[in-house]
Amino acid sequence: MRATIVFQGQILEPDAFERRVLRSAAVLRSVGIGEGDVVAMLMRNSPEAMEVMVATRHLGAQWCPVNWHFKTDEVQFILADSGAKVLIADAALLSALGGLQTGDAKLWTVRGSVPEAAAWEPVRDAMPSLDALPAAPRGAMFYTSGTTGRPKGIVREPMTPAQAEASVAMRRAAYGIESPLRALLTAPWYHSAPNGFALGVVLDGGTLYIEERFDAERTLRLIDEHRLTHAYLVPTMYVRMLALPAPVRARYDLGSMRFVSSTGSPCPPDVKRAMIDWWGPVINECYGASELGYMTLLTSAQALQKPGSAGAPLPGVVLKILDDNGRELPAGTPGLIYIHQPATPDFSYVGNAEARARMEVGGLKTMGDIGYLDDDGFLFIVDRKADMVISGGVNIYPVEIEIALQGMPGVADCAVFGIPDDEFGEALAAAVQPAAGAVVTADAVRAWLSERIAGYKVPRIVSLHAELPREDTGKIFKRKLREPYWAGRARNV
């Protein structure tokens, strides 16, 4: 916990950060938080988010980051489904959620106050530090979008000592963490990858510069001014920085950077090459999942040799390509990607044992991605068996959007799917079949959805169809809707 946190020009030195973590742990313990309990966190990137996360980990409890773009109903579901005993929320975010019912969960706010909740900081500062050894860490309870239309909560088993040691090695490989380091966090910490990046820096005793949101030129300025060494960025951020005028890009010295980690969505080879040409051989890409951890790593040198690859398995990782019958496929033959990552404790889904069981074959687990290994053992991802869309590094399952849209008057049926986007990797498109005699417009569709789901889930493209293409079974033929958008692309994700 000997980390330094820098936020909005204020420096939280290691002694002060450790004191706040142990006082936060004492507050949580005082309301009954212990091993296996859940602390929900509706918080923007901030020092308070880091201290509550580490305090929860210290108690062997699970921190449950909540996407701050979610609407009231979405937050309500996660609170109820996770069984969270505590919700700590940014006051501004909580105020924007009208009618949120927290049930029996204890509610605190940070960075402001609201009438219905106590402010966190005064309670924390008045509490003596917890004097107790840390419990076995359980990790975060991330909610990952699911094909049922509701997200699934990931419940981790406690880490064994061997897994704890292996997880340190995994984070160091995936994020390039090595002391001393000065790291930059600009991606939303509620996603598993930036969350793991921030946690790794803090546990390693590094200096973490926290930004509430990403800004292309400000990122360059921070690297230059503070001689930052590490960052977690996603391809969308690369695109935005590359779009800056050449004189702006040339203004900043980025030579201090040693390791940039990227994951979430595939990085187009031309974007990666442009970043390597600009920043040098410090651009790295991982393939991973909230459930399974990091699986592969692709360095800059490897990216230039094998454009389009997702990398080679990390040390200790078992990666196999299997057919639908569980048979291993030879190099060059696409199939389902199955993984075993020994650094990641086993998990279950809250109330969904069936979905968890479907993932596993012979001790290996799959997220439903389709790919192949080349003769050198490098992974190439070519498609997804599931319908998940990754836009700007965010996982989105269309079924949730389809359920919301099917409730719109005048809509007979619909299909939501991913289409290529140069900035975000993928964008959402909706194909809508109006009911007989109904008048439905694209603007009306977007307005309907905007009132019911987070803004990033609202499709950018809405097309209207007299009849949607269907398979013999009557199921909508999404592939026929997607294909025209992906024509001429090297891959379909």
Give the ranges of each region predicted by the language model.
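A short helix-loop-beta submotif of the ANL/AMP-binding
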Residues: 38, 44-64, 68-72, 81-86, ...
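AMP-binding/adenylate-forming catalytic core of the ANL superfamily
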Residues: 49, 70, 87-89, 221-223, ...
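Structural core segment of the AMP-binding/adenylate-forming
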Residues: 30-31, 54, 58-124, 131-134, ...
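Conserved pre-ATP/AMP-binding loop-to-beta segment of ANL
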Residues: 125-143, 149-150, 176-182
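Conserved AMP-binding A3 loop
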Residues: 13-16, 139-165
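Conserved AMP-binding/adenylate-forming core of the ANL superfamily
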Residues: 3-46, 50-54, 71-76
